UniProtKB/Swiss-Prot annotation:
GO terms for cellular component: endoplasmic reticulum membrane; mitochondrial outer membrane. It holds the Pfam family zf-CDGSH. It is found in: Endoplasmic reticulum membrane. Residues 1-35 are lumenal. The chain crosses the membrane at residues 36-58. Residues 59-133 are cytoplasmic. This is CDGSH iron-sulfur domain-containing protein 2 homolog. [2Fe-2S] cluster binds at residues 100, 102, 111, 115. Its cofactor is [2Fe-2S] cluster. InterPro entries: CISD1/2 (IPR045131), FeS-contain_CDGSH-typ (IPR018967), FeS-contain_mitoNEET_N (IPR019610), MitoNEET_CISD (IPR042216). The gene is Cisd2. Keywords: 2Fe-2S, Endoplasmic reticulum, Iron, Iron-sulfur, Membrane, Metal-binding, Transmembrane, Transmembrane helix. It is a single-pass membrane protein. GO terms for biological process: intracellular iron ion homeostasis; mitochondrial transport; regulation of autophagy.
Length: 133
């Protein structure tokens, strides 16, 4: 417990008091390169705490993070069915057909190119299944 006490009571205050924080706005322009380097670690710590708080308390950030990490593929199509299955007879296909694998299409089960936007959002590389006759 003594090392933590020393850190909080002595080391951290000494470090913070030695930082080259100017008294005026004009003082920021007079800082040397070495002074700017000394300000990087506390700036990174404050930015990290801010980003962590943003992820923890901002509803928009929670929605984005949970959508990327949920593991669910189908968020839209025929959610009332336990399993989505489409049977298509190969004889009904003219020359070729592209079928969706990303579950983002509005023309299910055919691909409408929605995987392009899906790939940008998630970093995925999914494309359609192309069936040729």
């Amino acid at each position: 417990m003594e090392p933590i006490s020393h850190l909080v009571k002595s080391s951290l205050p000494n470090y913070l008091s030695s930082l080259p924080i100017p008294d005026s706005v004009g003082g920021w322009f007079k800082l040397s390169f070495k002074d700017w380097l000394a300000l990087i670690p506390p700036t990174v710590v404050v930015a990290g705490i801010g980003y962590t708080a943003y992820l923890a308390y901002c509803p928009a950030a929670k929605a984005i993070c949970s959508a990327k990490t949920s593991g669910r593929c189908n968020n839209l199509i025929r959610k009332n069915e336990p399993k989505v299955v489409d049977m298509i007879d190969v004889e009904d296909i003219a020359e070729k057909a592209a079928f969706c694998r990303c579950w983002k299409t509005k023309n299910w089960p055919y691909c409408d190119g929605s995987h392009g936007e899906h790939n940008k959002q998630t970093g995925d590389n999914v494309g359609p299944i192309v069936i040729k006759k």
